[in-house]
């Protein structure tokens, strides 16, 4: 069994959990800045923070069928793009409406990542490692939340509109996630069930667990 390779691809995919946690928590440090900049009422502030859930619902509902049709890997790549766009647009937003739209886009990424990342890991991980590797995603969510708080702390005293840096810094790990996903194979289970590409799936399974596992 190529344990290191299996852990490697699982860790990359689980970075979606990190972005999920980071995106969920980072807004806490930016609340003061966005309230002043966009001149928000209490209702507008609450909606701008909570609107992510609407995107997450949409992402969660659509990610499953899309991943069944186009593959887990492609949907995860799309979530990475959504995280990158959301972080960048949120940081550059000049109006309340576009800020909310950017936040909802990030929510779609959250809804997709929280569903598809553990599915992918479960489909590539050997039975002996499956439980611990799937839990990587949950661990990364907690790490992402923690990193967001530390990031906000170190960026809060920057001159000018520090909230833009707080929200925009997420684009860096999101783009890294986007690039890293191209190094992971497509789900062997999906390749067989959807495309009947037994030979292609077999190559991945051999790389993960050897010929006996395949």
Language-model-derived ranges and their functions:
Residues 1-214:
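Transmembrane-helix signature of 12-pass secondary carriers
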